[in-house]
Amino acid sequence: MPMSLGNAFIKNFLGKAPDWYKVAIIAFLIINPIVFFFINPFLAGWLLVVEFIFTLAMALKCYPLQPGGLLAIEAIAIGMTSPGQVKHELVANIEVLLLLVFMVAGIYFMKQLLLFIFTKILLGIRSKVLLSIAFSVTAAFLSAFLDALTVIAVIISVAVGFYSIYHKVASGQSVHSSHDHTHDEGISELTRDDLENYRAFLRSLLMHAGVGTALGGVTTMVGEPQNLIIADQAGWQFGEFLLRMAPVTVPVFIAGMLTCMLVEKFRIFGYGARLPANVRQILLDFDSEERKNRTNQDVAKLWVQGAIAVWLIVGLALHLAAVGLIGLSVIILATAFTGVIEEHSLGKAFEEALPFTALLAVFFSIVAVIIDQELFKPVIDAVLNVEDHGTQLALFYVANGLLSMVSDNVFVGTVYITEVKTALMEGMISRDQFDLLAVAINTGTNLPSVATPNGQAAFLFLLTSALAPLIRLSYGRMVIMAFPYTLALSLVGFIGIMFLLEPMTEVFYSLGWISHHVAPAADALLQSGH
């Protein structure tokens, strides 16, 4: 019997998502305007934030762009925020959007080099604990100079490469044949266990690398977008930023590495999976096959990609241009010198990042609602009104941490540093206290935010990437795997803020490594358009 038109509409709405999910989204769309107009706009704002987090948590059931986008469109339509405010948010975050469009695509054209390097690391280090630390330290080092999103894009691209090599062979095909690695039909029962173990192995490496990006990203002013904003407001240069953060970031880095060792050693929270012997053999065969078949043309491509990688790191570390523009230069150089000149070959590179770029634009419209409805204002006001300096520092760290777990850490960091700058201008706090608070804000937004994918853009990118469903990495699983790290980083960060920050900063002053800033200088900074 043919389907009625009404049923066809319902069937088409959100496609293959489960029926209960469709009902939930429709219920949200009905409830929100009622709460906004008849109960309380503030409550409606928080309801929207919770609903948006729900769509992120269900990313494996349905990509969050559609349900989240519907909620955002309705929020703008009923006046929770305005298209102007959304545009303002997008303009303010244009660097992040450019980064996603161009940098992630640029990394795609450096795949051969990345697979070459990481295959050597993966096959060279037998111990899983050492391998995990190697991934974490590499990610931390890279994200101290590059953006965390770029680093995660690199690691995702490597993991997809590893996954598809094994999947092809396990499905009974040759390594170089074209193959769809999203379907498991061709895999025999014997290799299915290996595949599950391999998925768990890749999951754990990706989570170690993801946390590594947070550990490295907090240390320097170029590590995360909000670090740049905070450094700009405080008038700090690269070296001063590094030193002022060190009393908190160094102990936290050590705690992160210890956590990495412990979860692998005791195989807890979903870690500890080893590389199955069969998979290792397939990767070894692939490596020797690649070596045998490598022509001079392939070697030339690797050299070109190596040179571009050097340009990428130098360009980003010295901030020679906006991150996205450096990404565009990578696309141009890599394609020109490796001979990729057809339009359809270029298109593939953009497939990974553009859905996420659209999702991020929706995310910024939710941020616009948070700003217009002043959802964080009660928390900020309460913290600013605390008299005791030490308590104020600790509370700033905690409040930032909690808000960064629900909202984007770039947004939280920006809101807080702006409010604190205003307090400094109005003479509510001294310049020295402002400098200490800036450290509390930076560490508070960067460290506890590893708890959930909505806190760190890099985690969100990983969760919504094409790789996540392949290795069965869901929102819930990410939260569980991040938990030991969240606990260790948040607690050690808190101890650093409470007991190490002030005495160590005084030591740095007395050694002459950093100098006291004066409030008028900050004033001049504001007037000069910062």
Swiss-Prot record:
According to its UniProt record, where is this protein located? Cell inner membrane
Annotated transmembrane regions: 23-43, 45-65, 90-110, 113-133, 140-160, 205-225, 238-258, 308-328, 351-371, 451-471, 479-499
- Membrane topology per record: Multi-pass membrane protein
| GO MF annotations in UniProt | sodium:proton antiporter activity
Q: Which domain of life is it from?
A: Bacteria
Keywords from the UniProt entry: Antiport, Cell inner membrane, Cell membrane, Ion transport, Membrane, Sodium, Sodium transport, Transmembrane, Transmembrane helix, Transport
Q: Name one GO cellular component term.
A: plasma membrane
Q: Which reaction does it catalyse?
A: 2 Na(+)(in) + 3 H(+)(out) = 2 Na(+)(out) + 3 H(+)(in)
Would the keyword Transport be found if you checked this record's keyword annotation?
yes
Q: Name one Pfam family in it.
A: NhaB
InterPro entries, alphabetized:
Na+/H+_antiporter_NhaB
Purpose: Na(+)/H(+) antiporter that extrudes sodium in exchange for external protons.
* NCBIfam families linked to this entry: NhaB, PRK09547.1
Identify its protein family. Belongs to the NhaB Na(+)/H(+) (TC 2.A.34) antiporter family.
Q: Which PANTHER family match?
A: NA(+)_H(+) ANTIPORTER NHAB, TRANSPORTER ARSB-RELATED
Q: What is this protein called?
A: Na(+)/H(+) antiporter NhaB
Origin organism of this chain? Answer: Vibrio cholerae serotype O1 (strain ATCC 39315 / El Tor Inaba N16961)
Quick one: which gene encodes this? nhaB
